[in-house]
């Protein structure tokens, strides 16, 4: 049987980003969603192979999105136009049930993650669209960054790695502006979307992740 690999999400998002649904107008921090009324309509789902189940739940007293993947790959993305120079910091909380035994950041057949949060930087020239992926890595050491095995236009940054903190809520804060510069050696254009994704289609495994509210912090 031929192994199917999902196309990197940030490329497909080009078809959904010509008209952005939200533009931050005031100089203040941006909370994408607090999940108090379910998942807002600003979030859209893109399926690649099967569908990861995304639902709002109460987990450890926190409202969050629970993602359940069983050999599937789909993502939730939130269209938002913002300048990383004005909103350089990305903040979120997450928790995973497990990492993926067959997951490998260097191989196409291992390009699955129990959890990832990423930012898409669209371009009118599709081959110039880029993405910064913050991953809960399977093998890549924490703090390291590598190109996605499908394309060098997607940078994979291991914010967490391995099983040490499985089952624990972790708070993350990343300097998106600096991460983009380190990944691609240049200043970023405006961003067009923030996405969350739990995918296991390439490895055929299972994973559950919980995502707390995502915020963009004003400089």
Predicted regions and their residues:
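Extracellular beta-strand ligand-recognition surfaces/modules
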Residues: 112-117, 152-162, 166-208
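Extracellular carbohydrate-recognition regions
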Residues: 26-47
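Bacterial N-terminal signal peptides
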Residues: 10-21
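Extracellular beta-strand elements of beta-rich domains used
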Residues: 35, 194, 213-216
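Extracellular/lumenal carbohydrate-interaction signature centered on repeated Trp-anchored short motifs
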Residues: 79-90, 163-166
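Extracellular/luminal beta-rich ligand-recognition
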Residues: 110-155
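Solvent-exposed strand-to-loop "edge" motifs in beta-rich extracellular domains
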Residues: 93-99, 122, 177
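Short carbohydrate-recognition loop motifs
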Residues: 55-75
């Amino acid at each position: 049987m031929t192994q199917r690999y999902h196309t990197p999400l940030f490329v497909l998002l080009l078809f959904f980003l010509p008209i952005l649904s939200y533009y931050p107008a005031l100089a203040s921090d941006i909370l994408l969603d607090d999940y108090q009324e379910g998942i807002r309509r600003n979030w859209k789902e893109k399926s690649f192979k099967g569908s990861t189940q995304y639902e709002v739940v109460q987990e450890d007293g926190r409202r969050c999105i629970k993602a359940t993947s069983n050999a599937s790959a789909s993502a939730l993305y939130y269209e938002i136009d913002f300048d990383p120079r004005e909103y350089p910091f990305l903040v979120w909380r997450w928790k995973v049930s497990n990492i993926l035994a067959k997951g490998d950041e260097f191989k196409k057949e291992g390009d699955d993650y129990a959890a990832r949060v990423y930012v898409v930087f669209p371009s009118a020239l599709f081959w110039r669209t880029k993405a910064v992926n913050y991953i809960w890595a399977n093998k890549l050491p924490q703090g390291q960054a590598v190109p996605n095995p499908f394309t060098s236009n997607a940078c994979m940054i291991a914010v967490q790695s391995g099983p040490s903190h499985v089952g624990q809520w972790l708070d993350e804060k990343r300097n998106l502006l600096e991460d983009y510069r380190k990944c691609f050696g240049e200043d970023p254009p405006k961003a067009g979307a923030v996405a969350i994704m739990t995918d296991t289609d390439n490895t055929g495994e299972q994973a559950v992740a919980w995502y707390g509210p995502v915020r963009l912090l004003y400089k």
